[in-house]
Amino acid sequence: MRKRDTSRWGVGKLYPSPAFWSRNEATDGLHTIQIGNQLLDILIRDRRSSTTVVTFQHRVSVRTPFPTLVGEKFTGEAGVNLIAVADPSVGLDPEVSLGWYLGNRAIGHLKPILHPILSEAIDAFHPKRLIFFGNSGGGYAAMNYAADFPNSIALTVNPRLDLSQGQDQDWATYMTKCHGAVGRTPYQRISSEYGVNLADAIPSSAQFYAAMYHNTGDSEFLEKNHAPFVKSRTGDLYIAERLDFDGNGHVPIPRDKLIETVRELATPSVPQSEAMKAAGFIRHI
């Protein structure tokens, strides 16, 4: 198990199962929901805003304690509510750097569990503007969940959106540590079940807005994930891109730029498409 440390968030509330969670419980602070022998952590910050941002974690190192809850500072500076979700699969083993919020052998697919939990938390805020945010590996979850919430915005930053290839070390570690996939046949079976390309999975009827930010200096992720998704889904999804150079390689978006982007997207009086344009995103039809 990965080392657990929640001291920075103070004393939280523990729920013995998802059945004990409801919108009435979605108050400011740390909430930990037991899912079997695993823990799902959610950090809520109620800033009395009409906009709520749901965040998903990025890749973490071996030394990073669990949970990783993203966005407390940048959403605070942007003045919006926060619902930050940690990936329980990352807590299973320190070698697991990413779980993409897919689930694991013990709990099965995570989305059927997490979706109603998120829905209750979101409903507690009654937001006029809803944004799902994820950087890198978190971008997969941001896009995956935003597609289920009409009129929401998926703000993805340098995302990995195609897990169907499954050929890198992060995926191999996730498969072995989280699913116990040993041997070629079990590995391929489980990998094909969980390793989904979102370009193929998101329904054409999804009524959300994809604000896709990418660093042009990160050519590998741009060419293998961002560009193919945009090319294949521009015809049936509302997609707008912002391509900036932030440095060579897989580097995060500069903090000030992220805060300003969220501020622009978070204005509910401005239609989503216009807010995206104001934030520098361009739609190619």
Residue map of PLM features:
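N-terminal cap/lid segment of alpha/beta-hydrolase-fold proteins
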Residues: D5-I44
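Short, surface-exposed "cap/lid" segments of acyl-processing enzymes
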Residues: L30-P94
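Alpha/beta-hydrolase active-site loop
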Residues: Y101-A124
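Alpha/beta-hydrolase fold nucleophile elbow
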Residues: F125-S136
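Glycine-rich nucleophile elbow surrounding the catalytic serine of serine-hydrolase chemistry
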Residues: G134-N144
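Conserved hydrolase catalytic core segment
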Residues: N144-A154
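Active-site nucleophile loop of the alpha/beta-hydrolase fold
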Residues: T156-Q165
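The feature captures the conserved acid-bearing segment of alpha/beta-hydrolase catalytic domains
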Residues: D170-K277
